[in-house]
């Protein structure tokens, strides 16, 4: 039986794969497994609590109701925070000291999909073992509470949203002694593309409260338009709007706002690697880059690593996935990490990737440095990269096939320190991703094509 939990919770087509019954069962199983993490006495009035948030997908309504029903039937009082970014749920799980945080979202996936993921007390994503434990008791009968032992469900989106926005703004603009709010982004004209998703209220408000002049696009969610030709996966509108309005820069979020990409004044995309480079250098300057190290994944561009090396900043690599980045950060005591896709984890303020936090800190660095985003990003040039997916192959054999490994070694020797190659099996499909980086796009294409041909010949099913 395949695992239900993937790299980012349970996902699938809403009402087909991810049904109300499954959401109910997940809520029921989660309180059994995660409820053991605390005691009744450490919560107000002796009640255990959970918090549920969701993105703007229409299916989020019935899934939130079902998930909350499962948890309240298990004896937990549930706070329904309504539509709120995923990192907002993580933050509130920590600051409100609830035992379980739950998010209903499929992030950057199309609208018909949805997902459920959990945060443990403290706002951290669950380790694999806890997800396995939830899956193991899914749908089982147990001695559920009755009478006064069952939980209540309360709805308070306004309070939850305001607490989160206050936190975000305070990361770059802590209140003055007289309780007035500084405006560090005053005069900064930016465009924010909210993907018609969970940060449609949060990001514009946080940026404005920090002083920015914000032009907002794709912030009118109707339940059906999340990520539709908008946000970080479709930045064309943002690029055009930045140029049309003479904005200094633009920021784009995905549906649940755990990632952020940017656009410079000329409409050029600034990816997660470049954003991480800019923020790592800023933290180093302020003495806040722990161990002078940035945590990245194997997909981060070699150009980033070479540029950081020249600045005296080390990099530590992990597997692809923000959960693996966070694991390494916690293990090594690092303060900043992330992915090329725009997941950036700033442990000074967050326990997970936070797109709105990334946007605020990036805008703040533009102001503090006195440079444009284009100038800042130019210090982190990206090597040309080519990626080819080779389908219908025995992906597990790629690491042991002699001809493939010999070919990889040969290409790496030829590239030296001017490029690299990477073979990565897909986690969900019978395919191998072949990636090459080189000094020129033509050479990257050439290397990638050669290797992809050998992979197809050797591993064909």
Swiss-Prot record:
Its cofactor is Mg(2+). One of its GO terms (biological process) is UDP-N-acetylglucosamine biosynthetic process. It catalyses: alpha-D-glucosamine 1-phosphate = D-glucosamine 6-phosphate. GO terms for molecular function: magnesium ion binding; phosphoglucosamine mutase activity; phosphomannomutase activity. Keywords: Isomerase, Magnesium, Metal-binding, Phosphoprotein. It is an enzyme of class 5 (isomerase). The active site is at residue 107. Mg(2+) binds at residues 107, 254, 256, 258. Binds 1 Mg(2+) ion per subunit. It holds the Pfam family PGM_PMM_I. Its EC number is 5.4.2.10. The modification Phosphoserine is found at residue 107. The keyword Phosphoprotein applies. InterPro entries: A-D-PHexomutase_a/b/a-I, A-D-PHexomutase_a/b/a-I/II/III, A-D-PHexomutase_a/b/a-II, A-D-PHexomutase_a/b/a-III, A-D-PHexomutase_C, A-D-PHexomutase_C_sf, Alpha-D-phosphohexomutase_SF, GlmM_bact. The keyword Manganese does not apply. Activated by phosphorylation. One of its GO terms (cellular component) is cytosol. Catalyzes the conversion of glucosamine-6-phosphate to glucosamine-1-phosphate. PANTHER family: PHOSPHOGLUCOMUTASE (ALPHA-D-GLUCOSE-1,6-BISPHOSPHATE-DEPENDENT), PHOSPHOHEXOSE MUTASE. Belongs to the phosphohexose mutase family. This is Phosphoglucosamine mutase. It comes from Bifidobacterium longum subsp. infantis (strain ATCC 15697 / DSM 20088 / JCM 1222 / NCTC 11817 / S12).
């Amino acid at each position: 039986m395949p695992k239900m939990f993937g790299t980012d919770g349970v996902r699938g087509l809403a009402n087909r794969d991810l049904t109300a019954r499954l959401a109910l069962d997940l809520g029921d199983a989660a309180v059994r497994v995660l409820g053991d993490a605390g005691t009744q006495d450490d919560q107000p009035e002796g009640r255990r609590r959970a918090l549920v948030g969701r993105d703007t997908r229409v299916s989020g309504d019935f899934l939130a109701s079902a998930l909350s029903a499962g948890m309240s039937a298990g004896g937990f009082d549930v706070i329904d925070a309504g539509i709120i970014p995923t990192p907002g749920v993580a933050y509130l799980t920590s600051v409100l000291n609830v035992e379980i945080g739950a998010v209903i979202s499929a992030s950057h996936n199309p609208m018909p999909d949805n997902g459920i993921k959990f945060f443990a007390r403290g706002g951290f994503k669950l380790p694999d073992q806890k997800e396995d434990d939830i899956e193991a008791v899914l749908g089982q009968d147990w001695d559920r509470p009755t009478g006064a032992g069952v939980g209540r469900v309360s709805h308070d989106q306004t309070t939850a949203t305001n607490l989160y926005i206050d936190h975000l703004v305070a990361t770059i603009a802590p209140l003055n002694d007289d309780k007035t709010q500084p405006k560090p982004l005053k005069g900064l004209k930016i465009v924010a593309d909210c993907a018609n998703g969970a940060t449609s209220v949060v990001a514009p408000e946080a940026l404005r409260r920090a002083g920015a002049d914000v032009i907002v696009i794709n912030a009118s969610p109707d339940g059906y338009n999340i990520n539709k030709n908008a946000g970080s996966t479709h930045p064309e509108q943002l690029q055009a709007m930045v140029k049309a309005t003479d904005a200094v820069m633009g920021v784009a979020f995905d549906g649940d706002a755990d990632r952020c990409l940017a656009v410079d004044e000329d409409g050029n995309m600034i990816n997660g690697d470049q954003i991480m480079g800019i923020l790592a250098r800023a933290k180093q300057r302020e003495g806040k880059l722990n161990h002078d190290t940035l945590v990245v994944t194997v997909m981060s561009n070699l150009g980033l690593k070479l540029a950081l090396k020249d600045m005296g900043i080390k990099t530590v690599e992990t597997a692809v996935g923000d959960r693996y980045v966070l694991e390494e950060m916690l293990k090594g005591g690092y303060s900043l990490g992330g992915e090329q896709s725009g997941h950036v984890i700033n442990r000074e303020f967050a326990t997970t990737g936070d797109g709105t936090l990334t946007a605020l800190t990036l805008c703040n660095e533009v102001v503090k440095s006195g440079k444009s985003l284009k100038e800042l990003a130019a210090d982190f040039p990206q090597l040309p990269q080519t990626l080819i997916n080779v389908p219908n192959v025995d992906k597990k054999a790629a690491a042991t096939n002699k001809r493939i490994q010999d070919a990889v070694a040969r290409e790496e020797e030829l590239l030296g320190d001017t490029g690299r190659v990477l073979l990565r099996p897909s986690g969900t499909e019978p395919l191998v991703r072949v990636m090459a980086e080189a000094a020129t796009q033509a050479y990257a294409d050439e290397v990638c094509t050669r290797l992809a041909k050998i992979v197809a010949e050797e591993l064909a099913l």
